[in-house]
């Protein structure tokens, strides 16, 4: 039986939980900043100093991961332009998403793809049409999860940075070739 995935906006009360997750090796491998730096970013989001919207996702009421949405138009400033020049090639109303599973024991259980699909449904209901995600090409587990959720690599864009596989969500799954 599939368990229910729910999404909830993150609050300051969730910071200790996130700090614990961020200290785990599977998280730190793909989110390069140290825990205190990441918590600072989250405090900026929660305080309205950053337009990124942070959420937790839960499995049957138990928090198991973090997901966020950011506006591409807001990323067209330094240092993001240097790190991700492809943001200039996307529509102004495009959004990007990032996510991570919290507890290591929840990895490779289809939770990430299900949470991402639920998040995309929420974003579609809010009117977003262009939704992208940019995993590290070496993160095969994440790429598989994103593909299950309907994301596909998009053609090489002018100025795309190495170390980034840009993927876009498609409303209908593409036939595997």
Give the location of each predicted region.
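A short, well-structured alpha-helix characteristic of acyl/acetyltransferase catalytic modules
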Residues: 1-4, 9-44, 64, 173-177
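Conserved catalytic-core motifs of GNAT/GCN5-like acyltransferases
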Residues: 73-74, 134, 147, 152-166
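Short loop/turn motifs at secondary-structure junctions and domain boundaries
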Residues: 45-49
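Conserved beta-strand in the GNAT
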Residues: 56, 62-71, 96
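Conserved beta-strand-loop-alpha-helix junction that forms the acyl-donor binding cleft
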Residues: 124, 133-143, 159-163, 170
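Conserved acyl-donor/pantetheine-binding loop and adjacent beta-alpha core of acyl/acetyltransferases
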Residues: 71-99, 105-107
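Conserved acetyl-CoA-binding loop-helix of GNAT-fold acetyltransferases
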Residues: 108-125, 144-148
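Short, P/G- and charge-enriched loop/turn segments at secondary-structure junctions
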Residues: 41-44, 81-88, 154-155
């Amino acid at each position: 039986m599939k368990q229910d995935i729910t999404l909830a906006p993150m609050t300051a009360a969730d910071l200790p939980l996130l700090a614990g997750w961020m200290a785990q090796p599977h998280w730190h491998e793909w989110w390069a900043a140290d825990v205190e730096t990441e918590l600072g970013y989250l405090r900026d989001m929660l305080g309205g100093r950053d337009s990124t919207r942070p959420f937790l996702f839960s499995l049957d009421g138990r928090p198991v991961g973090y997901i966020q949405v950011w506006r591409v138009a807001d990323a067209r400033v330094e240092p993001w332009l240097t790190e991700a020049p492809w943001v200039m090639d996307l529509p102004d109303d495009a959004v990007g998403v990032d996510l991570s599973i919290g507890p290591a024991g929840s990895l490779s259980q289809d939770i990430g793809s299900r949470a991402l699909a639920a998040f995309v449904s929420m974003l579609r209901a809010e009117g977003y049409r262009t939704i992208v995600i940019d995993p590290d090409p070496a993160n095969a587990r994440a790429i598989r999860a994103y593909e299950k959720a309907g994301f596909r690599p998009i053609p090489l864009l002018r100025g795309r940075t190495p170390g980034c596989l840009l993927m876009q969500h498609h409303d209908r799954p593409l036939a595997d070739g």
